[in-house]
Regions:
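Gly/Pro/Ser/Thr-rich low-complexity, intrinsically disordered segments predominantly at protein N-termini
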Residues: 1-193
Length: 193
């Protein structure tokens, strides 16, 4: 007979890293484990369109590093009860902020917030409230710019430090890197393919 398993009330990075590869994606929010299904095709297609354009610009101008593939970042604040690890669909880190090797042997999460975080909404993942909360958390913990991309509505919400809420781009608008990624501009039409 199977024995019942005790689920920890507060998760740590070490516990997150020890989870088996079971086809789900996981994040930690102040010690709380969040489980999400993998994203769908449109999610990957739109993410790739942004990644190519952004990577080309960043490499050409030697601005830093672009990472893709649900990369996890350790956003735990000093003294915070419970670890926080969030994964970004796409992220950019300026050259002068490229993360050092992990502080603990065996961990894969860098202890910084990227300068730019891109989240592509997927019907199988968070709803609007969940992605808004996630974007706010990125900005509150140090990201300089956040883009939440909604493929089904062809809208991008832009999040910036100091703003009470996001602003939405649609139609003929362009994504701009601003001070975070100088000179970067991408028409939304390119994102949708």
């Amino acid at each position: 007979m199977a024995q019942p398993q005790t689920v920890p009330s507060t998760w740590t990075i070490e516990m997150l890293e020890s989870l088996p590869d079971d086809g789900w994606q996981y994040a930690l929010v102040e010690g709380r484990l969040v489980r999400m299904p993998p994203p769908g095709y449109d999610h990957g297609d739109v993410g790739e369109n942004i990644a190519y354009a952004l990577s080309d610009h960043v490499r050409a101008h030697r601005l830093g590093k672009v990472v893709v593939g649900e990369t996890g970042w350790d956003l735990t604040r000093p003294g915070e009860e419970g670890d926080t690890v969030q994964a970004s669909d796409l992220a950019f880190v300026r050259a002068d902020r490229l993360p050092p090797p992990p502080p603990r042997k065996g961990t894969t999460y860098r202890p910084i917030a990227p300068d730019l975080v891109v989240e592509v909404a997927s019907p199988s993942q968070f709803g609007r409230d969940g992605l808004d909360d996630q974007a706010r958390r990125w900005i509150e913990r140090g990201a300089g710019l956040g883009w939440v991309v909604w493929p089904d509505r062809k809208i991008v919400d832009v999040w910036e430090p100091g703003a009470a809420d996001s602003r939405s781009l649609a139609g003929q608008d362009e994504l701009e890197g601003g001070a975070v990624i100088p000179g970067f501009r991408l028409p939304l039409s390119v994102i949708w393919g």
